[in-house]
Amino acid sequence: DVDETHTLGHXFXEL
């Protein structure tokens, strides 16, 4: 489940 971590980081960044 490494993709989940990347998605969270991207979302935060985007926000």
From Swiss-Prot:
Record's GO cellular component terms = extracellular region
Q: Name one GO molecular function term.
A: lipid binding
Q: What are the subcellular locations of this protein?
A: Secreted
Q: Does the keyword Transport apply?
A: no
Keyword terms of this UniProt record:
Lipid-binding, Metal-binding, Secreted
Broad class of where this protein is predominantly found: secreted
Q: Which tissues and organs express this gene's product?
A: Plasma.
Q: Is Secreted there in the keyword field?
A: yes
Q: Which family does it belong to?
A: Belongs to the ALB/AFP/VDB family.
What's its job?
Serum albumin, the main protein of plasma, has a good binding capacity for water, Ca(2+), Na(+), K(+), fatty acids, hormones, bilirubin and drugs. Its main function is the regulation of the colloidal osmotic pressure of blood.
Q: What else is known?
A: In the red-eared slider turtle, there are two forms of albumin, ALB-1 and ALB-2.
Q: What is this protein called?
A: 68 kDa serum albumin
Q: Which organism is it from?
A: Trachemys scripta (Red-eared slider turtle)
User: What lineage does the source organism belong to?
Assistant: Eukaryota, Metazoa, Chordata, Craniata, Vertebrata
